């Protein structure tokens, strides 16, 4: 078994909506990013790549490459997952923690789980997404941006 950890953060800037976990969430602010700014899928992709020793999302999809400008993070996740599977890994489970003062994530979490399970070709029982605040502390607490952490467990298919 292999464990990977991912982290991502994006600052608010411009107009909303925002995309988190593949879900378009109405909000007055947008997130500044080269791609669609989906902190949840970026952290998850990093966790999966880390568990497979394939580097990170920036190595695979560099923000210096114009091809990834405005990229759909669900497509990036699916491509990373294809590469991970090609190395002989299967999914154990993933756990995602979104850190944001606002907007409220709870109403959107069920759809995030659906999208992640679809993209990874797994059962929803293998996908957990939760959200928390920092009780108005730090940059997320001041409403300056959103952060996310993710953990992934992989298994070698032949073991």
Curated annotation (Swiss-Prot):
Q: Which InterPro entries match?
A: MECDP_synthase (IPR003526), MECDP_synthase_CS (IPR020555), MECDP_synthase_sf (IPR036571)
Binding residue positions for a divalent metal cation: 8, 10, 42
Positions annotated to bind 4-CDP-2-C-methyl-D-erythritol 2-phosphate: 8-10, 34-35, 56-58, 61-65, 100-106, 132-135, 139, 142
**Marked site: Transition state stabilizer:** 34, 133
User: Mind listing the UniProt keywords for this protein, alphabetically?
Assistant: Isoprene biosynthesis, Lyase, Metal-binding
How, per the record, is the cofactor bound?
A: Binds 1 divalent metal cation per subunit.
Principal EC category: lyase
Q: Which reaction does it catalyse?
A: 4-CDP-2-C-methyl-D-erythritol 2-phosphate = 2-C-methyl-D-erythritol 2,4-cyclic diphosphate + CMP
Q: What is its EC number?
A: 4.6.1.12
**What GO biological process terms are annotated to this protein in UniProt?**
isopentenyl diphosphate biosynthetic process, methylerythritol 4-phosphate pathway; terpenoid biosynthetic process
Which co-factors does it depend on? Answer: a divalent metal cation
Concerning Pfam families, the annotation shows: YgbB
Pathway terms, separated by semicolons: Isoprenoid biosynthesis; isopentenyl diphosphate biosynthesis via DXP pathway; isopentenyl diphosphate from 1-deoxy-D-xylulose 5-phosphate: step 4/6
The Gene Ontology terms for molecular function here are: 2-C-methyl-D-erythritol 2,4-cyclodiphosphate synthase activity; metal ion binding
PROSITE patterns on file: ISPF (PS01350)
Record family assignment: Belongs to the IspF family.
What HAMAP family would the database entry show? Answer: IspF
Q: What does this protein do?
A: Involved in the biosynthesis of isopentenyl diphosphate (IPP) and dimethylallyl diphosphate (DMAPP), two major building blocks of isoprenoid compounds. Catalyzes the conversion of 4-diphosphocytidyl-2-C-methyl-D-erythritol 2-phosphate (CDP-ME2P) to 2-C-methyl-D-erythritol 2,4-cyclodiphosphate (ME-CPP) with a corresponding release of cytidine 5-monophosphate (CMP).
What does the subunit section of this Swiss-Prot or TrEMBL entry state?
A: Homotrimer.
The protein's name: 2-C-methyl-D-erythritol 2,4-cyclodiphosphate synthase
């Amino acid at each position: 078994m292999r464990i990977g950890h991912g982290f991502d953060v994006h600052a608010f800037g411009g107009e909303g909506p925002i995309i988190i976990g593949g879900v378009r969430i109405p909000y007055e602010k947008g997130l500044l990013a080269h791609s669609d700014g989906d902190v949840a899928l970026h952290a998850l992709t990093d966790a999966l790549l880390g568990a497979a020793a394939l580097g990170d999302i920036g190595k695979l999809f560099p923000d210096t490459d114009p091809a990834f400008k405005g990229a759909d993070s669900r497509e990036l996740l699916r491509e990373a997952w294809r590469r991970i599977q090609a190395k002989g890994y299967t999914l154990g489970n993933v756990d995602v923690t979104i850190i944001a003062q606002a907007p409220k994530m709870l109403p959107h979490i069920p759809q995030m789980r659906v999208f992640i399970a679809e993209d990874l070709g797994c059962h929803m029982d293998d996908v957990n997404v939760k959200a928390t605040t920092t009780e108005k502390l730090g940059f997320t607490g001041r409403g300056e941006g959103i952060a996310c952490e993710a953990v992934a467990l992989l298994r070698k298919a032949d073991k």
